[in-house]
Amino acid sequence: MIKKITLITVSTLFFFGCSSKNNVTHSENLTALNWHYKIHKDIEDSNLDQADEDFLSLQAEHPSSIYIKTDLLTLYLAHQQNKEYDLALFYLSEYEKRYSSVEEIPWIEYQKIKMNFLKYDTPFTNQKMLLDIITMCDNYLKKYPNSSYAPEVSTILAKAELTNKYLNAKISRLYKKLDKPKASKLYETKIPSNSKPPVIPWYKKLFYW
């Protein structure tokens, strides 16, 4: 089972582009503690590619090491701070599957919502992703209404719903320009008068309707 998990981890990290990483060296035959120290040194040096590589080696050489648990969370936080949200989510999901306690689940699910919301950095696109975030928030608030993270999830939900309203309004206007009144009507929405539209960098506006 451990070998299978390691292989899955290797293949998943490869998917994220390990083959094209620069400034990565391969070491071997270190103690688990030395790998642990090396991973933390990599992160201190802002070399997350090397940290990923060294974590794979730690797992391969010491699959039962006590350091894997803490290093998964450390790498999650490091990639989150570096705005590499897909990799952050990968490490968090690995931690959840292998080590999380029941008490940690509300925090982990909140972190997943936050990461997905931070990934959504191009307003007026990818409505499915936006709707998925809204669904995740709704499910969280139903499942963990008394969680200490519920207020933050409610804030994300409000922002996502408002962004979706602006997106629907934009789609409605587009259909109206295309002389498709029925389709336009489907997307009509009322936007709060005191709200502000999502901010889009000028260079991204070139690709919007």
Descriptions of predicted regions:
Residues 18-209:
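Acidic, polar-rich low-complexity tracts and alpha-helical solenoid repeat scaffolds
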